[in-house]
Amino acid sequence: MDVVKKSRNTHGSNDFSELIVSVRRVAKVVKGGRRFSFSVLVVIGDEKGKVGCGIGKHLEVSEAKVKAVNAARKNMIRVHLRESRTLHHDIQAKFCSSKVMLRSAKVGTGIIAGGSIRLIFEVLGVQDVVAKSIGSSNPHNVVYAVFTAFRKMLSPKQVASKRSRKIGEIIENR
């Protein structure tokens, strides 16, 4: 069961958008039968380049969501964006059997992505991107594959230092 729910959370100076990617009822088999609980996958972001994901489990969905949001706040990462609207370069990543391809796009393209990838880019603040998910469409694995790609991404400053060049040379050769 995939549920998309967007909310603004304003606790102090942190202003994050929260999106529920999936809600699942899971069971633990015990001697007396099955114990049911809920597992919630949440992505949060400030729509300015910071994003995080987290999973929470509890007997109630609302409590599981609170746990997931707290886990997502602990897993926040910074993604360097070009002109605050798209990615700096194309990238591919894999997690388990889910593979994702993320490509930067021209102005006005929009977010061309499906399922849980679209939700990540919405809370990240990306406006123009093309993304493709190959293999397993399990929301957990797809989200983790996207985060693997974000961690592998390099800013122009990092590329310039690796190549012993100036940042201007890297940017003009796009």
From Swiss-Prot:
- Pinpoint the S5 DRBM domain residues: 16-79
- Which ranges form a coiled coil? none
Classification via SUPFAM superfamilies: dsRNA-binding domain-like (SSF54768), Ribosomal protein S5 domain 2-like (SSF54211)
Question: Which Pfam family, any one of them, does this sequence belong to?
Answer: Ribosomal_S5_C
Please provide, in alphabetical order, the Gene Ontology terms of the cellular component aspect for this entry: small ribosomal subunit
* Gene Ontology biological process: translation
Q: Which UniProt keywords apply?
A: Ribonucleoprotein, Ribosomal protein, RNA-binding, rRNA-binding
Matches recorded under InterPro entries? Ribosomal_Su5_D2-typ_SF, Ribosomal_uS5, Ribosomal_uS5_bac-type, Ribosomal_uS5_C, Ribosomal_uS5_N, Ribsml_uS5_D2-typ_fold_subgr
- GO MF terms held by the record: rRNA binding; structural constituent of ribosome
Note what the entry says on domains: The N-terminal domain interacts with the head of the 30S subunit; the C-terminal domain interacts with the body and contacts protein S4. The interaction surface between S4 and S5 is involved in control of translational fidelity.
The task this protein performs is described as: With S4 and S12 plays an important role in translational accuracy.
Family, per entry: Belongs to the universal ribosomal protein uS5 family.
Known partners and oligomeric status: Part of the 30S ribosomal subunit. Contacts proteins S4 and S8.
Protein name, per record: Small ribosomal subunit protein uS5
Q: Can you name the source organism?
A: Ehrlichia ruminantium (strain Gardel)
